[in-house]
């Protein structure tokens, strides 16, 4: 399963076999402005994906960047239901070993700062949305591309990075929320290192944020 644009330039979720055959579009919806990406199968064959279904934009860039919220799609009936109603983006839903779905959420109203991307989890129907790792913590700033460790009850792997900079590029970390759910306390190992302590990195940095129609300084 992967994401690419359709002939009309909208994003959608597709599937292809390893030998290149069986290419097909997975989500079919008649709404002309809806787009879909970051899809994943549920065990029962339904699909969870991100979508611009809220028709909203990121506040700190004047709404220029679309916000994605998660939807649940049933291929047999083409029924589409919205699962999250967040102000800012969700990313990378994936089924955990316990059957719940974990994902990254841009938590704009978190306890510590407005640019935290924390790891969340929920039931496949969108109920019981809860923080799994990083809520109320200054470190890590963002955690992307999370995947559960096969055969483990709670551990997962993800890339930690900052708010600005190279998108989704950073340090590959193994987490175990059963040990702790904030800071470096629940980080088991940084890959590819072994027996190397993980030290929290928290810095205060000023930068100039310029757009074609703006001149301002953010701290």
Describe the predicted segments one by one.
Residues 9, 35-37, 66, 89, ...:
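Beta-rich catalytic cores
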Residues 27-31, 83-87, 133-138:
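Surface loop/turn motifs at the tips and blade-to-blade linkers of beta-strand repeat domains
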Residues 208-215:
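Conserved small/polar residues in nucleotide/adenosyl-binding loops
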Residues 42-43, 96-97, 150-152:
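Residue-level detector of Asp-centered blade-edge/turn motifs that repeat once per structural unit
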Residues 6-11, 60-66, 111-115, 165-169:
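Short, solvent-exposed loop/turn segments at conserved positions within beta-propeller repeat blades
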Residues 14-19, 66-75, 116-125, 171-180:
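Beta-propeller blade signature
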Residues 1-3, 47-51, 101-104, 155-159:
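Residue position within the beta-strands of beta-propeller blades
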């Amino acid at each position: 399963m992967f994401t690419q644009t359709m002939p009309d330039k909208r994003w959608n979720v597709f599937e292809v076999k390893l030998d290149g055959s069986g290419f097909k579009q997975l989500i079919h919806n008649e709404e002309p402005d809806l787009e879909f990406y970051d899809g994943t199968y549920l065990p029962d064959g339904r699909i969870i994906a991100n979508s611009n279904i809220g028709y909203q934009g990121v506040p700190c860039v004047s709404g220029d960047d679309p916000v994605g919220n998660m939807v649940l799609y049933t291929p047999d009936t083409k029924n589409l239901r919205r699962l999250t109603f967040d102000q800012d983006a969700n990313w990378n839903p994936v089924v955990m070993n316990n059957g719940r779905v974990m994902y990254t959420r841009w938590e704009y109203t978190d306890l510590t700062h407005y640019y935290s991307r924390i790891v969340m989890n929920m039931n496949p129907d969108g109920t019981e949305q809860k923080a799994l790792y990083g809520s109320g913590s200054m470190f890590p700033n963002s955690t992307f591309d999370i995947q559960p460790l096969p055969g483990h009850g709670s551990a997962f792997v993800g890339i930690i990075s900052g708010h600005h900079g190279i998108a989704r590029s950073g340090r590959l970390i193994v987490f175990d929320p059963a040990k702790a759910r904030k800071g470096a306390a629940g980080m088991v190992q940084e890959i590819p290192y072994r027996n190397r302590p993980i030290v929290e990195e928290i810095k205060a940095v000023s930068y100039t944020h310029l757009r074609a129609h703006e001149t301002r300084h953010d701290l």
